[in-house]
Amino acid sequence: MRNSKITWSIVAGVALALIAGVGVAIAVSRRSSGPAAAPVTSSSAAPLVSITPSASPAPSPGADIKGPLDLVLIGVDTRVSIPDWEPHADTIMLLHVEADLKSAYLYSLPRDLRVDIPAYRKSGFGGGKHKITEAMSRGSRIPGSDKKSVEQGYELLTRALSAYTGIKTFQGGAILNFGGLDKLVDQLGGIDMKIDQKVKSRHRKPDGSMRTLSGGDYIGPQATYQPGVRRLVGWQAIDYARQRYGLPNGDYDRQRHQRQMVEAILAKALTQGLSDPTRLRPVIDALGTSLVYVGGRTPFEYAYALRDLTPDKITTVDLPGEGVGSGGGYLGEQLKDEGRGFIKAIAKGNHRQYLAGHPKLVDK
């Protein structure tokens, strides 16, 4: 299998906090086919509303959210230190929440996945077949301006996702940059991750400082993550989930590690009672402008709606893929038939039956 040629920075992101569940729900309602709503950063979240019953109890915020839900979790590489750098969706995770809002399926798409990206008038993009990460960058352009709009990029990305997956509407989405995830993990006091293979960092020294870039590569001592359950602080969690070089399956191993990180964040959030909005508020506020969510719902509404979605009820799914090229040149990635089959099954609502017939897709 040819490894994806991608660079990482998250999330998301994962969006990787791009987490929707157990109160760290930062995906906010919007329609993928509609106009982008005004962006909201975590520091400007809606006023906190108590969910404690009163003498005349009103419906809890988020009580009207109904399943099933399809949420987009995006980790963005902004490279703000580089002039004219355009945002790239370096991590793309999709979370399908069942109708009862008590179980879900988490899966990743390669950022180099080759797809048809629709035309987008706001940025002047005429459409074409590209790596899906380019939907974020091409959509972010503002004609006549040097500025970039992450929110526009998100809108075009979700349109491309809808076209590829057949999922007509994504009810929520969130964008988190590299620094935001670092802050999130540290706000939680670190996370416990089960490291499934030895991983050497390309970017960090054992003390967390950056390795020296020389001649197009990094030199110096490397941080190393040994198999086993390890307590990781923010920079370690991000660094571990960032690595793809030297791994047997390259980016596909990295995608699995990122999903594992999301599960670890959810597990830690559960132990800290972050389904309680009063405890969730400081965590979200600490992310500041690192977190952007789009639309009219707040993280606190999703925190209530998904209060029963615990980590053990989230099935992580591995979608195998392979590189595609032309004339010896690399063009991107494509999912293998069984991976595409799962995507189609999600859109049709028969994913449980599909996984029963393809049990190897379920991460162990």
Describe these PLM feature segments.
Residues 2-12, 20-364:
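Non-catalytic, solvent-exposed segments at the cell envelope interface
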